Amino acid sequence: MALALLEDWCRIMSVDEQKSLMVTGIPADYEEAEIQEVLQETLKSLGRYRLLGKIFRKQENANAVLLELLEDTDISAIPSEVQGKGGVWKVIFKTPNQDTEFLERLNLFLEKEGQTVSGMFRALGHEGVSSATVPCISPELLAHLLGQAMAHAPQPLLPMRYRKLRVFSGSAVPAPEEEPFEVWLEQATEIVKEWPVTEAEKKRWLAESLRGPALDLMHIVQADNPSISVEECLEAFKQVFGSLESRRAAQVRYLKTYQEEGEKVSAYVLRLETLLRRAVEKRAIPRRIADQVRLEQVMAGATLNQMLWCRLRELKDQGPPPSFLELMKVIREEEEEEASFENESIEEPEEGDGYGRWNHEGDD
């Protein structure tokens, strides 16, 4: 919605949105002179500009400023963020063909769906655009009208075509809405498998969740190898933003993890699995022997009753070792059987209790 705010602000100030920037995330207690000092240093490559206004954005608890560029500027020179005092300030700007490219993709999509632009506006509850007026409207105005229609339409507008990723920037000071890298990576690894689109579209959707250094890295790896896959992109993110834990450290951490007091064996195995996968990812443990290593560590690190020990020993001797789910099934079955036996023992009356149903009937 930041781009929509930029467009509305430019319209109010009667300035060209293609020659304007909006900088957000500025601490609320900053004076205009302090803001100018930071911007003059970080935006000096853009030439002369004019600060048109400042507003407070409640949802960010921070200020935003609008700048008008007074010289022709190479859009590639505009940074996506600047390092301000107290954190990163985001730079919002509009590319020259952003509206045209968007509308071209929109028209192509509507054609495939057998729909029209005017029909889409009607579905959104906006009656001001008809099939006769669409050809006469500029791309900029049409994009603006579409933004207005979507803003006032009932939610959700359409069923989700794909699950979106949470935001990740890789910045030293992450924004409140960002996920930690490990959480974002786990989510991304699973979700990209669900996207029923081409690799190129997957990379575009992945880039939509990125900001700052993370987005810069995405551009770098794609420029270096245009045919790079989404999985290879995620691998690059691991190399740059992932944990610095060494292979040896990952291996030792796994082998030194034991069942805790009061912890069920199944809970221990689940906790152990996270460490095993991390060790496999770092190639500290070969993937081909992961099942064997898992079984051996459970037998060494857990407190097992005799029945479960025998079952696991039998699985180890017979081979091949069970998978994670197969092992969990065996353990859960044994835990349920043990719990059932304990309940029966509690309910069974002790000798001498009850109504004497086993007394000899012939006794006087």
Swiss-Prot record:
The modification N-acetylalanine is found at residue 2. It is found in: Nucleus, Nucleolus. It holds the Pfam family PNMA_N. One of its GO terms (cellular component) is nucleolus. Its main location: nucleus. Keywords: Acetylation, Nucleus. Residues 335-353 have a biased composition (Acidic residues). InterPro entries: PNMA (IPR026523), PNMA_C (IPR048270), PNMA_N (IPR048271). Residues 335-364 are annotated as: Disordered. Coiled coil: none annotated. Belongs to the PNMA family. This is Paraneoplastic antigen Ma2 homolog. It comes from Pongo abelii (Sumatran orangutan).
